[in-house]
């Protein structure tokens, strides 16, 4: 019990330093594709007017240059998503990795500290967050129509985005065939303090998301309480231990941050992953969980995890 409490406290403190709602009827899912910037034959930026959020959202898509119908992998960012470019393409080799693969990789921009969910109330710092409505109702028809999507989807993400991937999959089980979390904590009972701290650390009011701790909305978004809704899906989780590894041997400006903050965060995530795995096992739900003996909460490892996850996710989508 003490180990669990310490892990929660460490995760809550460190995470904030590092970089549809039940009982409410969401606005009608209507979005408009404003424009497309074809940045290359295999990379496009879509500018989509979201009715739910009353703003234009940029979504970058990695896609084959041609061909027929294909699945889509919605890949979410961390606590501080890129504004002009997805951090997945800026900090990892995701673009070259997916080149030649028969899949659309959908990378939404923006949404700092949003947890990609529908907030109960508009926030003075962030404005109107209705990310679940956007990602699950407004965006998929546009992606499928524009990039020959065949309706087969997976969703994944790192840290905040990985938590959100499991939340969205549990709340929208018919939409996704596979789910991936890279250094994510899908057990909100353990992650609650970290989530609230991280939102406040970025200037938001955590109560505007799902209300105060103990509110019904927290339970209604907790994948650990909805594991049966993940049954039949391909599930993937990956985590390190917080112990510095090969990427800490690289001399780079963020090295101290990766070790002194990224290490404790990843240790907390590892403990949370164990708790979530126990929930899955108790329900007899299989999952592929890669536990790396070393690794901090940092982008070099998330790039590695993305590679390691594809032999699990690709076949589930019908894409190699």
Predicted regions and their residues:
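Non-catalytic cap/lid and distal C-terminal segments of serine-dependent acyl enzymes
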Residues: 5-11, 18-320
């Amino acid at each position: 019990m003490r180990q669990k409490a310490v892990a929660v406290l460490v995760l809550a403190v460190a995470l904030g330093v590092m970089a549809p709602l039940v009982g409410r009827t969401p606005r009608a899912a209507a979005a408009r594709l404003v424009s497309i910037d074809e940045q290359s034959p295999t990379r496009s930026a879509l500018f989509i007017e979201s009715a739910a959020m009353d703003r234009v959202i940029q979504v970058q898509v990695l896609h084959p240059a041609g061909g027929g119908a294909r699945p889509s992998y919605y890949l979410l960012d961390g606590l501080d998503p890129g504004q002009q470019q997805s951090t997945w393409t800026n900090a990892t080799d995701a673009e070259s990795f997916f080149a030649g693969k028969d899949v659309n990789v959908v990378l939404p921009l923006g949404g700092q500290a949003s947890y990609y969910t529908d907030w109960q109330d508009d926030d003075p710092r962030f404005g109107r967050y209705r990310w679940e409505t956007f990602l699950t109702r407004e965006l998929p028809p546009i992606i499928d129509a524009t990039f020959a999507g065949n309706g087969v989807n997976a969703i994944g993400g790192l840290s905040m985005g990985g938590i959100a991937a499991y939340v969205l999959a549990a709340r929208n089980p018919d939409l996704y065939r596979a789910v991936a979390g890279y250094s994510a904590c899908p057990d909100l009972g353990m992650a609650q303090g970290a989530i609230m701290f991280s939102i406040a650390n970025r200037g938001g009011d955590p109560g505007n998301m799902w209300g105060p701790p103990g509110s019904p909305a927290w339970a209604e978004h907790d994948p650990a309480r909805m594991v049966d809704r993940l049954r039949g899906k391909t599930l993937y989780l990956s985590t390190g231990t917080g112990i510095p590894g090969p990427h800490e041997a690289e001399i780079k400006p963020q090295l101290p941050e990766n070790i002194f903050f990224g290490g404790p965060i990843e240790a907390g995530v590892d403990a949370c992953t164990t708790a979530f795995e126990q929930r899955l096992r108790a329900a007899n739900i299989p999952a592929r969980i890669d536990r790396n003996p070393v690794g901090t909460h940092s982008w070099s490892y998330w790039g590695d995890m993305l590679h390691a996850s594809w032999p699990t996710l690709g076949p589930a989508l019908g894409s190699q």
